[in-house]
Each structure stands twice: as structure tokens, then as C-alpha cells.
Regions:
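Short, positively charged
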Residues: 6-7, 150-157, 195-198
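Acidic/polar alpha-helix N-cap and adjacent early helical turns
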Residues: 189-203
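AMP-binding/adenylate-forming catalytic core of the ANL superfamily
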Residues: 25, 31, 47-53, 60-63, ...
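Conserved ATP-binding loop and adjacent catalytic segment of the adenylate-forming AMP-binding
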Residues: 1-23, 37-41, 50-52, 62, ...
Length: 203
């Protein structure tokens, strides 16, 4: 996708643009059906610039590219009526709480509005009642003090009740790769250990 120089500024800064010439994109649900305009689903693309597959790895290729040639990116995205796409998260990061799909990025962007929050990461942890619960790891701005009750109060009435983090932890930083990418799975695993949850419950 791309934005054009003559696209409105609000489009250029709030989306990843529209499909490029001679390529196709679609947003699909878990069953491969195209979702309605504005609804989140997996971002798929097809065309001359899309890879043919993984070198010498037919199994991985079959996971990424379906029989009709669509490459499944693993990105969660929406598309508006004018064809502008917006990436809203990663499928592997999505939390399913009590049958509701919860997108961590949405909660993270909301919590960034809190004046004391410098950075935040949202993950799902196993829960016997709801399947998964929301957990927030929060890094505060220098010199700030905050507690779980303040975060909950900030969320009340502003986001859906099932999106409010049940667990809130204040941290100095996040586990990262050598290239600086945050490793959410390590946050999740740390919470599983702390809460005494069984890994089998995450399946």
C-alpha cells in the first residue's frame, strides 16, 4: 500500500494508504471471508511483487500463501470505504476474553493518553473463567508515581469494561530483541510465572 502526495494530510498520517497499481489487497476473517468495511481482519495481498514462497520450505509457504495466491501477512487491519487501510495490530497478539476479540494496540493507544505513562504493552494471560485476561505493563515518565487504582479509574467509562486491564504492573523497561523489538511473549510468560498459571491453559 502507499499514500500519494495529493492525498489529504489526515489520510497520510492515519493510514498505510491504498493498494498500489497491479496489486490486490483484502481484509479477511478467520474463515477467509472478506470482512465488512471498517471491520478488523487479516491483511492479505496478491500480485506481481508478492513473494512466491519461502526458499526450500514448502510447509511454511503453505502457511503464508493460500491456494488462490493470497499472502496472509499476520497483520490485523481495517479498510475504509475509500480503500485506505490501517494496521491495528498482529493476529498473534490478539486477546480473546470471554468471547470478545481485544486488540492490544487499541488499549495501548488509550493508555498513552495518561499523562504519567511513557510506554505501555498489553498482553493476554490465561484465565479460567474468561479464557484470557488483560495485563498491562506500564513504564512511567521519570519522577512520576502511579498505582493500579489510578489506571483503572482512568479507564472507567472510557473504554469497554472487558478491555480494562485486570493486571497492571509498573516496570522500568520491556524485554527486547537485539534489534529493539519488544518481545511480548516474554511479558506473557513472566506473568504466567508470577501468577502461577499453567502453560497448558494458554492453548
Amino acid at each position: 500500500t502507499q499514500t500519494a502526495v495529493d492525498d489529504p494530510v489526515e489520510r497520510r498520517v492515519s493510514s498505510v494508504g491504498r493498494v498500489q497499481p497491479h496489486l490486490e489487497i483484502r481484509i479477511v476473517d478467520a474463515d477467509g471471508r472478506t470482512v465488512p468495511i471498517g471491520q478488523p481482519g487479516e491483511f492479505c495481498t496478491r500480485g506481481y511483487s508478492v513473494m512466491l514462497g519461502y526458499w526450500d520450505d514448502a510447509e511454511k509457504t503453505a502457511e503464508a500463501i493460500d491456494a488462490e495466491g493470497w499472502m496472509h501477512t499476520g497483520d490485523l487491519a481495517t479498510m475504509d470505504a475509500d480503500g485506505y487501510a490501517n494496521i491495528v495490530g498482529r493476529i498473534k497478539d490478539m486477546v480473546i476474553r470471554g468471547g470478545e476479540n481485544v486488540y492490544p494496540r487499541e488499549i495501548e493507544e488509550f493508555l498513552f493518553r495518561h499523562p504519567k505513562v511513557e510506554d505501555v504493552q498489553i498482553v493476554g494471560v490465561p484465565d479460567e473463567k474468561y479464557g484470557e485476561e488483560i495485563c498491562a505493563w506500564i513504564k512511567l515518565r521519570s519522577g512520576e508515581v502511579c498505582d493500579e487504582a489510578e489506571i483503572h479509574a482512568f479507564c472507567q467509562g472510557q473504554i469497554a469494561h472487558y478491555k480494562i486491564p485486570r493486571y497492571v504492573r509498573f516496570v522500568d523497561g520491556f524485554p527486547m530483541t537485539v534489534t529493539g523489538k519488544i518481545q511480548k511473549f516474554e511479558i506473557r510468560e513472566a506473568m504466567i510465572r508470577e501468577l502461577g498459571l499453567r502453560a497448558a491453559e494458554t492453548a
